[in-house]
């Protein structure tokens, strides 16, 4: 099975390229732009795509790939910065544009007798595309031709032609991977299926079959342990490994007392029909004891992480392997051209287990994006209610009770959050938002209930829309809905007399408050 290799030059859209390719049914991988030719050969790519990027190809710190890629005989498509890399490599020129293009633009496709000159634009009319560039090609490389133009970019799309046509090298100034490019997926499909001749043979089913075989080979007769939370990633990972090795997998669910209302019972009920062997550990007392009087969010996260490790360590006996629900965006972040980004928050993850345990990692989902994890889950027969659950932070409600954590404050938050989620589901809004939750603030406000003055807690509601959690906009929920939720919480939850709605987007805010 041939894959498509995406060379990452630092574009914010690089992950989108890989996702769009997989939607076409072809497996894709992202590697840094400076990956050596030998490593690229090892991937045996059926096509290579050069991503966009923030640099200028004529700058001193410009990024350039190994020039050997142009001699591999593999079709190459350059996007934005990738186009400019191609243009300069083959002798063309790139310069700063007098008029930058950011946002929608219309392209005109070059035609002959009514048909596009390039196979790349088969079945694609003049249409809107998404631009994001300050530089443009100002001199065409010899042996190339223009296949599309825009009002500001005469060489908006180019390709090798004539004696160089056999190179199958193409360049686009716009971004076909972005949804605002109306025929972007069609263009990528033309490149991959018609020009590169690849077969769309990647699917959740083929992925599962490959992983089961690989897990069995890796594990042999050894036993495996998996920390499970009832969330999408850990559940899908556990079920996939269980399909491969059955009773050799032991799952541990640590109830840290920081879960949503009745969450422990719900998780065990969810996991039972999936055929998993799960050991429930009630650790509420030790977690709350160690968190007492701790207000700093970073300290809370570290205490929770250390405590989890301590408890999880007690559950490990003869196991040689640990299952972890790492996803592809985590892998990309660790190897991208930008390198690991600055730590905004410490991540609570079983991956922090001490090295002395000498557990080998099994990461069956490390090649998948979140939407693909859900698709694999469906193929495995996991219930839709589990697969479409909203993300929940590893440290649980400890980072939604701002300030110090106590059982009393946790219970107040649980009751309020249950009302919010219950109303979202009853109004068919739950699946229209990426994530929704409540936050108990470390402030109190004056209120009046009946004839009495109150001085009680303030609660914030948070709901966001997103496709991947990398960026998010606040959800524009109906005013009548918010009014009903607020009234219910204030009347039904003791200890809250004021409700606010968070209308911050990410960035600059993060989705979670801590």
Curated annotation (Swiss-Prot):
Keywords noted in UniProt: ATP-binding, Glutamine amidotransferase, GMP biosynthesis, Ligase, Nucleotide-binding, Purine biosynthesis
Active-site residues per Swiss-Prot or TrEMBL entry: 80 (nucleophile), 175, 177
Pfam families cross-referenced by the UniProt entry: GATase, GMP_synt_C, NAD_synthase
Example of a GO MF term: ATP binding
Domain of life: Bacteria
Signal peptide annotation: none
SUPFAM superfamilies linked to this entry: Adenine nucleotide alpha hydrolases-like, Class I glutamine amidotransferase-like, GMP synthetase C-terminal dimerisation domain
Pathway, per record: Purine metabolism; GMP biosynthesis; GMP from XMP (L-Gln route): step 1/1
Annotated ranges, domain Glutamine amidotransferase type-1: 3-201
Catalytic activity: XMP + L-glutamine + ATP + H2O = GMP + L-glutamate + AMP + diphosphate + 2 H(+)
UniProt cross-references to CDD domains, sorted A to Z: GATase1_GMP_Synthase, GMP_synthase_C
EC number: 6.3.5.2
Domain GMPS ATP-PPase: 202-389
Function: Catalyzes the synthesis of GMP from XMP.
PANTHER family, sorted: GMP SYNTHASE [GLUTAMINE-HYDROLYZING] (PTHR11922:SF2), GMP SYNTHASE-RELATED (PTHR11922)
Assembly description: Homodimer.
Name used for this protein in its record: GMP synthase [glutamine-hydrolyzing]
Species assigned in the record: Chlorobium phaeobacteroides (strain BS1)
